Design a protein with these regions (language model features):
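Flexible "cap/lid" loop of the alpha/beta hydrolase fold
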Residues: 1-38, 125-126
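Alpha/beta-hydrolase
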Residues: 33, 37-115
Length: 171
């Protein structure tokens, strides 16, 4: 099951070349990661802050609480800090410009029943998901919500996942 998967088809040689030649450190997600606040007084302060602004303000309360619970570690001074250092996250976002393209190419190797789901309000191009589905021989399914649609309504997410796995087991 691919859910808002970052597997990007090559649209044309010019866009591929432009994408792969962007200078290191310029990816917007890497820039944002490097600006993250590392140390916080407590988890409730993080929940209040993250839950008050995009993109995490769209998450269900229990999803945001789980994200903060597992995404931060306790410090000896009583405060908490990000479990993943901002620079580590930035390196992941900025490391391999070919990753999404190579991931897309590997979709043709998938032999198991698959699904491709994406959010109706995603900031990613629907074309990505339609092309992924085409590679897998399935229809892309648009779900109401953002890039984080799976975490916006936990009960709906459970139903979506169960229905797709049950459908896959029947194939």
């Amino acid at each position: 099951m691919l859910i808002e998967a970052i597997a990007m088809p090559i649209v044309d040689d010019a866009s591929h070349e432009q994408f792969s030649k962007q200078p290191r450190g310029s990816h917007p997600l890497a820039v944002g990661a490097r600006k993250r606040r590392v140390v916080w007084p407590d988890r409730s302060t993080v929940i209040e802050s993250y839950g008050s602004r995009p993109p995490l303000n769209s998450l269900a309360k229990e999803a945001l609480e789980a994200y903060v619970h597992w995404g931060f570690k306790n410090r000896e001074d009583g405060q908490i800090e990000l479990a993943c250092a901002p620079e580590t996250e930035a390196i992941i976002f900025d490391s391999n410009r070919h990753g999404p393209i190579e991931s897309f190419k590997k979709l043709s190797d998938v032999e198991s029943p698959s699904s491709v789901l994406y959010g109706s309000e995603s900031d990613l191009s629907p074309t990505w998901f339609e092309k992924q589905a085409e590679m897998l021989g399935v229809q892309a399914e648009k779900i109401d919500g953002s890039h984080f649609f799976l975490f916006e309504d936990i009960h709906r997410a459970e139903k979506i996942i169960r229905s797709h796995f049950l459908r896959s087991s029947d194939e």
